[in-house]
From Swiss-Prot:
Transfers a succinyl group from succinyl-CoA to L-serine, forming succinyl-L-serine. It comes from Xylella fastidiosa (strain 9a5c). It comes from the Bacteria. SUPFAM superfamilies: alpha/beta-Hydrolases. Belongs to the AB hydrolase superfamily. MetX family. GO terms for molecular function: homoserine O-acetyltransferase activity; L-serine O-succinyltransferase activity. Residues 45-354 form the AB hydrolase-1 domain. The keyword Cytoplasm applies. This is Serine O-succinyltransferase. The keyword Cytoplasm applies. It holds the Pfam family Abhydrolase_1. The gene is metX. Pathway: Amino-acid biosynthesis; L-cysteine biosynthesis; L-cysteine from L-serine: step 1/2. PANTHER family: HOMOSERINE O-ACETYLTRANSFERASE (PTHR32268:SF11).
Length: 370
């Protein structure tokens, strides 16, 4: 399996050796990132975006890559994250297969793919790697740090590990720890991959590839990324046309089944299964409460920033809205002027990607006031 690196990616060589939180280290590792806008002379207009598990660093198009990005409607000139004003950096997470060093990368020491020899990955490792990029660009303090989904966890880790790195923070559909439901879902996703005989303890290749396992894992993910409300309105119980079905017992019959199958089919050859395992587990392990003797609100209160916005969707079952409320409350206890906003978007966890009409205005208003 190979990495999937967007054209126009930039790369930062991490300090070597790069120590990992749970032990081990990386040698000659790198982080992929992309930028938009221009850094001002005082280097005070920078925004860092930390993405979720599967996205690359290509959040929006730019001169080196004209393809629309995964947050195209949110980022650009005159958009909520206005690149006419801000210098924006988006980092591909350490452990991914989209340009940053991960299990699908080659170990420069052994000249073989890391696979399961990659050190245990924590959210904190991605946080430390991202800040190396920020410092390499000559930025001492970010105007704002934005994290969505898994990136919301990474952003909190950055703020805990690197005090004074940002003046403000926007946490979008993120959390300060993984809840049992989310851990259970991700556990099933990892099990589906590992039970595929082609996974072969991580030693698969393009000929013998755990496609079935990764496809099931992705389907489970998609179900949790959206909401029952959206499924009802979008698909109902509508069945497929006869030319879309076959005579296979228990085969696809409903449109919702076909949607999941199509979505999973597109995903399986654009993401490495071992990387999926590592990143998924890192989310389960993350817990802000570890920074304050088991008290999650006290852990959040250790963060020192001027302003924050925690925003999410009431239909999110993967990162429930209570978790964004918790982030805002904890930050307030530490003296941050923190605002919480819950939206009625029907798209569940993925709402921040598609409901720009809902998420865009509060993000724009927050940044405009900085």
């Amino acid at each position: 399996m190979t990495e999937f690196i967007p054209p126009g990616s930039l790369f930062h060589a991490l300090s070597s050796p790069f120590p990992m939180k749970r032990g081990g280290q990386l040698h000659r590792a790198r982080i992929a990132y992309e930028t938009w806008g221009h850094l001002n002379a005082s280097a005070t207009n920078a925004i860092l975006i930390m993405p979720g598990l599967s996205p690359n660093a290509h959040a929006a198009h730019h001169d080196s890559n004209a393809e629309p990005g995964w947050w195209e409607s949110m980022l650009g000139p005159g958009k909520p994250i206005d690149t006419d004003r801000w210098f924006v950096i988006c980092v591909n997470s350490l452990g991914s297969c989209k340009g940053s060093t991960g299990p699908a990368s080659y170990n420069p020491i052994t000249q073989a793919m890391y696979r399961l020899d990659f050190p245990a990955l924590s959210i904190e490792d991605g946080a430390n790697a991202a800040i190396e990029v920020v410092h390499a660009l000559g930025i001492k303090q970010l105007a704002s740090l934005i994290g969505n989904s898994m990136g919301g966890m990474t952003a909190l880790a950055i703020l805990l590990l690197h005090p004074d790195i940002a003046r403000s923070h926007i946490n979008i559909s993120g959390s300060a720890q993984a809840l049992p439901f989310s851990i259970a879902i991700r556990s099933l996703q990892r099990e589906a991959i590992r039970l595929d005989p082609h996974w072969n303890q991580g030693h698969y290749d393009d000929t013998h590839y755990p496609e079935s396992g990764l496809r099931i894992a992705r389907k489970l993910g998609v179900i949790t990324y959206r909401s029952a409300l959206e499924w009802d309105g979008r698909f109902g119980r509508v069945r497929l046309d006869s030319d879309q079905t076959n005579d296979t017992p228990f085969g696809l019959e409903f449109q919702i089944e076909n949607y999941l199958e199509s979505h999973a089919h597109r995903f399986v050859h654009t993401f490495d299964p071992n990387c999926y395992l590592y990143l998924s587990r890192s989310m389960d392990w993350f817990d802000v409460a570890e920074y304050a003797n088991g008290d999650i609100l006290a852990g959040l209160a250790r963060i020192r920033i001027q302003r924050a916005l925690a925003i999410g969707s009431h239909t999110d079952i993967l990162f429930p809205i209570q978790q964004q409320q918790q982030i805002a409350e904890g930050l307030r206890r530490g003296g941050t002027h923190a605002t919480f906003l819950g939206l009625d978007s029907p798209q569940g966890h993925d709402a921040f990607l598609v409901d720009i009409a809902g998420f865009g205005p509060p993000v724009k208003e927050f940044l405009d006031e900085l």
